[in-house]
Amino acid sequence: MAFLPKFDAGGLVTCVTTDAATGDVLMVAHMNDEALRRTVATGEAWYFSRSRNALWRKGESSGQTQRVIEMRTDCDQDAVWLRVEQTGAACHTGRRSCFYRRVERTEADGGARLVFVDADRLFDPDAVYRK
């Protein structure tokens, strides 16, 4: 059976990336055809930045790399899941995961608030991404 990803109108598929050792969700990003091909060919995670309209290899600026242990696709082949060996932080904020805030319901008004969890920074993003 062939891997034939179904890209959206922008030429992208959603990618969920988890830590292969812990199962923790590290990040959600997007991949275009080139990012998928490079990920398969190199065993390193490559993504497509919608904000920069550019291909990028995880860790090329920060040194916080992802070695792919396994890649899966969903039933429609319009999303992929990477299980990776994460070196350092996955989030551009310097945190291990991009999911460092829990959403909790507020009793008083039935709204929601954010609570920081696992929010320690592993690196200073201002120092790493300084231009």
From Swiss-Prot:
Named cofactor requirement(s): Mg(2+); Zn(2+)
Catalytic reaction equation(s): 1-(5-phospho-beta-D-ribosyl)-5'-AMP + H2O = 1-(5-phospho-beta-D-ribosyl)-5-[(5-phospho-beta-D-ribosylamino)methylideneamino]imidazole-4-carboxamide
Any one Pfam family match given in the protein's UniProt record, by short name: PRA-CH
Cofactor detail note: Binds 1 Mg(2+) ion per subunit. Binds 1 zinc ion per subunit.
Localization, UniProt: Cytoplasm
Domain of life: Bacteria
One example GO MF annotation: zinc ion binding
Enzyme class: hydrolase
Binding site for Zn(2+): C75, C91, C98
GO CC aspect terms: cytoplasm
GO biological process, one term: L-histidine biosynthetic process
Alphabetically ordered keywords of this record: Amino-acid biosynthesis, Cytoplasm, Histidine biosynthesis, Hydrolase, Magnesium, Metal-binding, Zinc
Involved pathway(s): Amino-acid biosynthesis; L-histidine biosynthesis; L-histidine from 5-phospho-alpha-D-ribose 1-diphosphate: step 3/9
InterPro entries, A to Z: PRA-CH (IPR026660), PRib_AMP_CycHydrolase_dom (IPR002496), PRib_AMP_CycHydrolase_sf (IPR038019)
Functional summary from the UniProt entry: Catalyzes the hydrolysis of the adenine ring of phosphoribosyl-AMP.
Record-linked NCBIfam families: PRK00051.1
Subunit structure comment from the entry: Homodimer.
Name of the featured protein: Phosphoribosyl-AMP cyclohydrolase
Species whose genome carries this gene: Bradyrhizobium sp. (strain BTAi1 / ATCC BAA-1182)
Gene: hisI
